[in-house]
Amino acid sequence: MWKLFGAFLLLSVAPASADADTIFPRPLPVNKDNARGYEQLLNPALNKGVLLVAGKNLYDPNFEKTIILVTEYTEDGTVGLVLNRPTEITVAEALPKLSEYMPYLDYLYFGGPIATTSISLLLKSETRLPGTNQVITNIYHINTLDLFNVLLINKIDKRYIRIYAGFAGWAPGQLESELIRGDWYIWHADINLIFNSEPGILWDELIRMVTAKWVSR
């Protein structure tokens, strides 16, 4: 499991006084001659509900060998959750009250390096959950509602609940620039990938598939 350097929930991304460029670096200039990069933005299209697969040459320790589910993609920027970094912190340790009602929840997941004290939830529900963010069909991201009520009112299969601390974020144009540079591949998301029972090998499996796709073109 991915270690979060001890006291996970005490980590912060930047001092409160940090300006926007510290948290969201300015995007690199876009090279419009990079046809492969632009094709990457379109097939599948960069949008909410796709997966970002870290390229082999992405060495940023926050994102190296990560799989990220894009939960928001708007003119204000992009937000996502890292899917394949379970921590060594149990839900019982981080959220003892929730654990009383949901004792089967095991480990907290590292969602990304921004706002690591914030908690959010991914879950599968066959019924619409009003007021939540539907990422793809039957998959919901919850970070504003009361987690207790959502979990207690709706009977959720324990295989399809993940709790995350922190998230990943990009300023407008920043992720597009990183895609064109080759830092990421885009892949279609589905329930089996989002709630993969072996997150430790998820990147290895997906990087083989995405690179094979490019080689075959």
Regions found by a protein language model. Give the residues of each.
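Sec-dependent N-terminal signal peptides
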Residues: 4-12
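C-terminal segment of classical bacterial N-terminal signal peptides
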Residues: 13-17
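A short aromatic-anchored loop/beta-hairpin motif
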Residues: 18-217
